[in-house]
Amino acid sequence: ANFTHEWLDNLDRILEGRKPDYLIVQHMEPDHAANVANFLKVYPETTIVANAKTFTMIQNFFGLDLEGQKLEVTNGGTLNLGNHNLTFVFAPMVHWPEVMVTYDSTDKVLFSADGFGKFGALDVEEDWDDEARRYFIGIVGKYGPQVQKLLKVAAGLDIQIICPLHGPVLTENLGHYIGLYDTWSSYTPETEGIVIAYTSVYGHTKAAVELLADKLRSKGCPKVVVYDLARDDMSQALSDAFRYSKLVLATTT
């Protein structure tokens, strides 16, 4: 409820008394779209722009049929706003079936939905790669082929700004971020190294893992990372399993 008021208050302040003509809904997951109905209570004349799957979800989530105030777009469809021309690109399963991204050819902005997002707070200085990797692997990781299709479309666009639904707006070194997404979604290891992930009931498997890790390090393995899956951060273990070139699983019988 608090976020609802904060979001609507922010819109009111930015609009300065104007009424929005359109609300573009790219992704229906509730952390993004939960306030569509509340938005329409404040701005009932706004046209909702979305694809067919999204409109079905809006009906199912909120009981809204939006008759007379919806604009259904197709893959590759455009919307001319006067100074801005928007192109809609469907990105199913990145990471829900209705997802689409929007490209503004005037400002050369890609509104990338959950793509290029990351965990963390904007007021905390931290490396983008680590939290973006953990976010990608945990949420989008199994949809690599779908991400690859989206990247092929993005390669044909002049993108100068990426605006994801999670994390910071990206304005510099975009090739680095796009390159990492290509690596992650093609399941190509980033770094030579070994992740050892284990569970141990009585400590014997743990002892074997520690012995293995010591031997690998003594043989010059560039990076050995060990995770106790009963105690360590599972999302970090999963992220590193994709990051490094080799994975060893040790478990009780």
What are these regions (language model features)?
Residues 1-23, 46:
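Pre-active-site segment of Zn-dependent metallo-hydrolases
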Residues 21, 160, 245-246:
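Conserved acidic residues
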Residues 29-31, 55, 229-235:
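Short acidic loop-to-helix transition motifs that present clustered carboxylates
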